[in-house]
């Protein structure tokens, strides 16, 4: 007997989600929630940041309901990080208890696996604030894209940020592999090289630092791919979701929004 293919509804049920009355793009449900959250629209959801913080930051922050507000909150957190004023908010016992039954993050961030770019620290955020997905060079596959779709559609974040970074090793390795005329790499690393090849080729002959140019080009290409998603694209067109690219400077700690 052939087992039925897994559907989106089955996945949500298996994850412990309560989907009654919920529509795609309006869901603010969490896979960890034990209580029924009901249907919430993007414009009315109460983000995680509104729960009491358990660290050095403000006890209560105003709700985030738009991509612009989410970007502003990330920018403020990064400014604290750069100036060594990080409050390490949303990390203590009070916060942990507050988010134990439900999560309402305000941004979904795709970043690289580089150990020098810990996304929550870079933006001075804590428990329940961000949906973070990481892959080498921000390379997309079905798992990565599906995770991002989950963040924006089911958890209802109004912002999807793609974060590249200075001296990305994955992009640098791709450049070296292509220059050596034998781009094949060991194991599934070859998959990364092939995925990053278009960004490297796109900047061939361009003035400036080749690696930096390719990193920026890769962020743009990833954003273009995400806009083709049948989940992400319509959310952006409807105004419920904002997509943005950014570049993290290893030397300064600063995040520059594209």
Regions of interest found by a model, annotated:
Residues 119-120, 171-173:
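Short glycine-/acidic-enriched loop or helix-start segments at secondary-structure transitions
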Residues 110-112, 134, 161-165, 244-249:
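Short beta-strand segments
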Residues 113-138, 143:
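Active-site cofactor/substrate anionic-group-binding motifs, chiefly glycine-
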Residues 1-23, 27:
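N-terminal secretory signal peptides and thylakoid transit peptides that target proteins
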Residues 12-13, 33-104, 128, 137-146, ...:
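Divalent-metal-activated hydrolytic enzyme cores
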Residues 115-116, 166-170:
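Gly/Ser/Thr-rich loops at beta-strand to alpha-helix junctions
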């Amino acid at each position: 007997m052939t087992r039925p293919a897994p559907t989106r509804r089955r996945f949500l049920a298996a994850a412990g989600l309560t989907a009654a009355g919920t529509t795609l793009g309006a869901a603010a449900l969490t896979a960890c929630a034990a209580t029924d959250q009901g249907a919430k629209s993007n414009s009315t959801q109460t983000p995680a940041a509104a729960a009491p913080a358990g660290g050095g930051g403000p006890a209560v922050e105003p709700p985030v309901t738009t991509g612009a507000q989410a970007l502003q909150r990330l920018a403020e957190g990064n400014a604290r990080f750069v100036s060594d004023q990080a409050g390490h908010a949303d990390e203590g016992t009070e916060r942990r208890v507050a988010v134990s039954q439900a999560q309402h993050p305000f941004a979904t961030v795709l970043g690289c696996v580089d150990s020098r770019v810990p996304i929550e620290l870079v933006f001075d955020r804590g428990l329940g604030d961000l949906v973070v997905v990481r892959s080498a060079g921000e390379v997309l596959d079905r798992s990565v894209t599906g995770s991002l779709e989950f963040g924006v559609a089911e958890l209802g974040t109004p912002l999807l940020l793609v974060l590249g970074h200075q001296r990305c090793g994955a992009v640098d390795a791709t450049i070296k592999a292509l220059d050596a005329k034998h781009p094949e790499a060991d194991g599934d690393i070859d998959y990364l090289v092939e995925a990053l090849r278009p960004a490297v080729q796109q900047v061939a002959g361009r003035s400036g630092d080749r690696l930096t140019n390719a990193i920026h080009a890769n962020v743009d290409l990833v954003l273009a791919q995400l806009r083709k998603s049948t989940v992400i694209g319509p959310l952006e067109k409807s105004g419920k979701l904002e997509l943005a690219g950014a570049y993290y400077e290893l030397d300064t700690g600063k995040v520059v929004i594209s």
